[in-house]
A protein has these predicted regions:
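Structured catalytic core of nucleotide-sugar glycosyltransferases
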Residues: 1-135
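A generic fold-level signal
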Residues: 2-4, 64, 91, 160, ...
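Short conserved micro-motifs on helix faces and helix-strand junctions that flank
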Residues: 5, 12, 72-74, 166, ...
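Residue-level signature of catalytic and energy-coupling elements of molecular machines
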Residues: 27, 85, 102, 124, ...
Length: 316
């Protein structure tokens, strides 16, 4: 078994050619950082080349570089890339720091995170205290997501503004990497492990290069992944709605029966009949969709496919 030693920084990279060299230099300049692990998640630009050129230049100068590059065979997604990095450092590090490679997470904050860890923290979570650079719609939608998630999920509570920028003690890394589910939601999985967390506020800066790969649809899908991964309340909601609609239907049938007995039958109401049929049909289709989402997740989990494949490992 490899000896666990030092603080290892883990960062997934996807199309970050404009900033990746600056990111490497800033991370390695932080006091307390012992090693940097970059995971190229199938980048389509020159990200991989930029990292290899950096390594080659340092080697030609005879300068040792505490940097390891994991090249995945394709784009498996950020969650899988982070897991690949943590799998690699699991038996090598005393603590691991998860950080984005686009420089919106300030690498200099790692020094304060390490200080909290050395003081006894098991998890150090960087929490955004400023969202002025984002649109009003994005701020409101994010706030709505956290409120809904914390209401429908009993086992954990998410801290608004907390993302993937965290320091994890070695036992936390070990526990987290044991969770091998396919639909991963790290923001929820890390609190679910139950380790105590210390929070550090920070201000997220604008991107200095490149563009985000997270579209609004991807963000919405990620939000639903989080809720469906940690709660069966959507199933219970549709069960309750079915009971409610059935109860109202029986009540309405009773009203019609009494009215017919007292004043005679009404003329056929085609409009009201169509409204009722379409309403019930819509309810049924939505309910089937919710049920299908859960069944689909069971199907994906049952195949137990690996989360990623590594093409090459390049150590500096």
């Amino acid at each position: 078994m490899t000896t666990r030693d030092g603080v290892w920084v883990v960062a997934a990279c996807f199309n970050e050619e404009a900033v990746i060299v600056r990111f490497i230099e800033r991370v390695l300049a932080v006091p307390g950082v012992d090693h940097l692990v970059l995971i190229d998640d199938g980048s389509g630009d020159a990200t991989l080349d930029q990292i290899r050129i950096f390594l080659s230049q340092r080697r030609s100068l005879g300068v040792p570089v505490p940097l390891t590059l994991l090249e995945l065979t394709r784009n498996f997604g950020k969650e899988a890339a982070m897991l690949a990095g943590l799998d690699y450092v699991r038996e090598r590090c005393a603590a691991a720091v998860l950080i984005d490679s686009d420089l919106q997470h300030p690498p200099e904050l790692i020094e304060a995170m390490v200080a909290e860890w050395r003081a006894g923290a098991e998890v150090v979570t960087a929490v955004r205290d400023d969202r002025d650079q984002e649109s009003r719609l994005k701020v409101l939608s994010a706030s709505w997501f956290y409120r809904v998630f914390n209401k429908v999920v009993d086992s954990i509570q998410l801290q608004e503004g907390a993302g993937d920028f965290r320091l994890l003690d070695a036992p936390v890394v070990e526990a987290f990497t044991q969770l091998r589910e396919s639909s991963r939601f790290s923001k929820g999985l890390l609190p679910w492990t139950g380790y105590r967390s210390v929070e550090l506020p920070y201000q997220r800066v604008s991107r200095v290069g490149g563009s985000t790969s997270w579209s609004p649809l991807k963000l919405i899908g990620y939000a639903f992944d989080g809720i469906f991964s940690f709660s069966v309340l959507p199933l219970k909601v549709w069960t309750g709605l079915g009971v409610l609609v059935s109860g109202l239907s029986l009540l309405y049938a009773l009203v019609i029966a009494l009215r017919t007995a007292l004043v005679g039958p009404d003329l056929p109401g085609y409009a009201s009949l169509m409204v009722a049929v379409l309403f019930l049909g819509g309810i049924q289709l939505i309910g089937i969709g919710v049920l299908g989402d859960y069944i689909g997740r069971i199907y994906v989990e049952s195949k137990a496919r690996p989360h990623y494949f590594i093409r090459s490992i390049d150590q500096g």
